[in-house]
From Swiss-Prot:
Mg(2+). Can also accept Mn(2+). This is Acetate kinase. The record marks 179, 240 as: Transition state stabilizer. Catalyzes the formation of acetyl phosphate from acetate and ATP. Can also catalyze the reverse reaction. Substrate binds at residue 90. Keywords: ATP-binding, Cytoplasm, Kinase, Magnesium, Metal-binding, Nucleotide-binding, Transferase.
């Protein structure tokens, strides 16, 4: 049997899932962390619950990838490298170059490198991952799958900002969005659950995790999305601020006497639930404190829910209603109270969450009441499987 590996390389990490094909069964998954630091950590899950863990230095992505592939052989997961016939790489920023997933060649790698200014923490690391796998698996069918491609064809009225048009022409100043692979996956599953073609549906997909984005989907395509030029925009997140008045950013930056880079760092890593609660970026910690009377945590949760509610409401207006609202990712999949709260506040639109159906974690399910006008669906995301599907589609076209 041939195997396909889906890869997500971060600035100091490599995460992967290995699939048997064509069954699409996951035979191994894991990650290597702290690449480039004094001591790294590798963890691989395989077989019937077996786990391999090791602490050792990984000076760069190349050594991490070589270790990973060697371990797949050492653990008996594959017998030889050439069993892995395809590699799919998740890439954060595809700009306006890439409106779909593509087979990787030298030109594609050059473009990914050029787009690094749009995602300086991600694209360079992802390019290192591509090169590392190409060195060890030179004959594997390699594909790049972009977080931004799903949103690249959204209407200009939603993609562009109300700033001088030449900023878009000269600098690519527009909304690129993120989590596109996740939104595509759950939208396709929603269509199957509803028994209708995706092209005939109006959906609002809510990827609510540490990073969070909400997308309005019309005729199977992204119509609008909450994240913007970067993944910092949109709803309140674990450590990210979401939408903030730019004047406030400039005002506080001046008061603190810090650089633009330091200000962006604060908005990315010290804001959101963490900044509001001054306690934790983890929703569970904030909820527990709120239940014990912590007023600041109560407020943080109210703001968090309200920002999600505002985006869903605006997208219901933009789409002229919806067939379904879909929840996915860490909070969306696992937090029944959050789903119930959002559903209850959308009752005016015909949304109704059934508390009994909603009493579930991480399981694909219609959690709406039988008489709901707009369905509420819980769909665990599977970005790696979406990458595998893109590989197979491009293989057939090759």
């Amino acid at each position: 049997m041939s195997k396909t590996i889906a890869v997500n390389a971060g600035s100091s990490t490599v995460k992967f899932k290995l699939f048997d094909m064509p069954s699409e069964e996951v035979v191994a998954e894991g990650n290597i962390e702290r690449i480039g630091m004094d001591m790294g950590h590798a963890k691989i899950k395989y077989g019937d619950g077996q786990v391999s863990e090791e602490e050792k230095p990984f000076p760069n992505h190349g050594t991490a990838v070589s270790y990973l592939l060697d371990q797949l052989i050492n653990l008996g997961i594959v017998k030889e490298y050439h069993e892995i016939t395809a590699v799919g790489h998740r890439i954060v920023a595809g700009g306006e170059f890439f409106k779909d997933s593509v087979v990787i060649d030298d030109d594609v790698m050059q473009k990914i490198d050029e787009l690094a200014e749009y995602a300086p923490l991600h694209n360079p690391a992802e390019l290192q991952g591509i090169k590392a796998f190409k060195r060890v698996l030179p004959d594997a069918f390699a594909v790049a799958v972009f977080d931004t491609s799903f949103h690249s064809n959204m209407p200009e009225m939603n993609a562009l900002y109300s700033v001088p048009y030449e900023w878009y022409e000269k600098y690519g100043a527009r909304k690129y969005g993120a989590h596109g692979t996740s939104h595509r996956y759950v939208a396709s599953r929603a269509a199957e659950m509803l028994g209708k073609p995706l092209e005939d549906l109006k959906l609002i997909t809510c990827h609510i995790g540490a990073g969070a984005s909400i997308t309005a989907i019309k005729n199977g395509k992204s119509f609008d999305t909450s994240m913007g030029f970067s993944p910092l925009a949109g709803v309140t997140m674990a450590t990210r601020s979401g939408d903030v008045d730019p004047s406030l950013v400039a005002f506080v930056q001046s008061k603190l006497g810090i650089s633009s880079e330091e200000m962006i760092e604060l908005l990315n890593h010290k804001s959101g639930l963490l900044g509001l609660s001054e306690l934790s970026a983890d929703m569970r910690d904030v909820q527990a404190a709120a239940e014990h009377g912590n007023k600041q945590c109560e407020l943080a949760l109210e703001i968090y829910e309200n920002r999600v509610l505002k985006y869903i409401g605006s997208y219901l207006a933009e789409l002229g209603g919806a067939d379904a609202i879909v929840f996915t990712a860490g909070v969306g999949e696992n937090d029944k109270e959050f789903r119930q709260a959002i559903g209850d506040k959308l009752a005016y639109f015909g949304v109704k969450v059934d508390p009994e159906k909603n009493d579930v974690r991480g399981e694909e399910r219609d959690v709406s009441a039988d008489d709901a006008k707009i369905k509420v669906l819980l769909i665990p995301t599977n970005e790696e499987l979406m990458i595998v599907h893109d590989i197979e589609r491009l293989r057939k076209q090759a």
